[in-house]
Each structure stands twice: as structure tokens, then as C-alpha cells.
Amino acid sequence: MGRAFEYRKATKLKRWGHMAKTFTRLGKQIAIAVKAGGPEPENNPTLRGVIATCKRENMPKDNIERAIKNAMGKDTSDYKGMTYEGYGPHGVAVFVDTLTDNTTRTVADVRSVFNKFGGNLGTTGSLAFLFDHKCVFTFKKKEGMDMEELILDLIDYNVEDEFDEDEEEGTITIYGDPKSYAAIQKHLEECGFEEVGGDFTYIPNDLKDVTPEQRETLDKMVERLEEFDDVQTVYTNMKPASEEEE
């Protein structure tokens, strides 16, 4: 299934963490989308994608509408997407994706965790070569659909030929070039796919083996980072736990 499949499979269920934190992070994404393209989903592709993700994460409709309304009434222009990267314990690369209105606070918070766990926060871009930046779309599967044909249609947007299928949820997830986000979303919607949720992710291109004890320490570091409201997602190049470890 390729180098990234086991990582994606292992991280899918823990993509957003606890529900309350999930809604906070999605609310911030709604605010950014509204600020950039307005409050009407039909005229704002980015907002449509976020709302579809909200629905998939079981965010109540009232919460979504309130987040849009709040975004219209406050200044969200100071929110910035910032990434922080470095090495955690045992030489594992750690990539922290944030949305913040105070970079001084955020970098101090992130650095404190790296220091606490004996890691080293590097400069922006220093570990970018270890991760592939991708846009990711999840949508409802159509009965009798031909995935090979769909992937072929999207080849100009550098969509990977590998995809994830969740039979229980009846969804397909594809990965492509971040620069082609809007074009991929438009194509999927024009093809009649429902609940097209869009996002961005970082996938490690070289997974590092760790012992169960090392994994426990690294998991604690990731959990500590995810406690900060500014942190959207934490990525590592730690190899997923085997079934024996679990």
C-alpha cells in the first residue's frame, strides 16, 4: 500500500483528538475561511470543505452556524498559520501545525514542550524534507464508482494513485498537491460527490522505528503539545505501533 499508508491508517482515528478540542480547532478554521471568502458556503469553497469536515466529525449544526456568525463579528485577520518543527526524544522528527493570533506565545509554548522532553526546536523549514505536504479530501463513495477512472481524471492535479477507503463510513479519501486544492474540490463537486471535506496534512516520507518505551514518551510529548489551543495538529515520523505493541 506504499510508505505512507500505515501511517495514515494509524493516525486517522486520532486525527482530531478529544471532541471539545476538535470543535475548537474546527471553529478556528471556519473563522479563517469566512474571513478569506465570506460567510456563504455556496460562494466560499474553502468554507464548504471545512463545513463538510465539521459534519463528518459530528459537530452540531448550531455550533457551525455560531462559528460562522462569530467570525463575521470579530477581527480574525491576525490569525496566522505557523509551523514549528524539530527533533523530539530518540531522534524522532516532530512537526507542529498551528493557527495563532500571537506567535510569541505559541513558539514559547511549543519550545517549552520540546525542552521538557529533551528535544530541540529547529528553524522553520529545517525538517520539511522529511514530510510531504498534501491536500486531503474525504467524500461519500458512489455505488459502482470506478476509482481508477477518477484518479486518472485528477492526474493533472498530482493526486496520488493510492487512496484510503473506509467501508464502515462509506467514504473515500484522496491526497493531492496542496496548490491544486480548489481545482480538486471543484472537480469532485462537479462529479456529484457528496460531503466533500477538504483539509491539509503532512505525511512523513521515512518512518522511524522506536521501542514501546520510546513510543510512550513520544506519545506523551504529542499529547502535551495538543493541549495548546493554538495547535491544530502534531505530526511525527514515528512508525505506527504494531498490533503486538497495542
UniProtKB/Swiss-Prot annotation:
Gene Ontology BP term (one): regulation of DNA-templated transcription
GO (cellular component) term, any one: cytosol
Presence of keyword Cytoplasm: yes
GO MF annotations, alphabetized: DNA binding
Protein name listed in UniProt: Probable transcriptional regulatory protein BVU_3469
Compartments it resides in: Cytoplasm
Cross-referenced Gene3D superfamilies: 1.10.10.200, 3.30.70.980
Domain of life: Bacteria
Primary location group: cytoplasm
Keyword terms: Cytoplasm, DNA-binding, Transcription, Transcription regulation
Pfam families on file: TACO1_YebC_N, Transcrip_reg
HAMAP family: Transcrip_reg_TACO1
Similarity field: Belongs to the TACO1 family.
InterPro entries referenced in this protein's UniProt entry, alphabetically: Integrase-like_N, TACO1_YebC-like_2nd/3rd_dom, TACO1_YebC_N, Transcrip_reg_TACO1-like, Transcrip_reg_TACO1-like_dom3, YebC-like
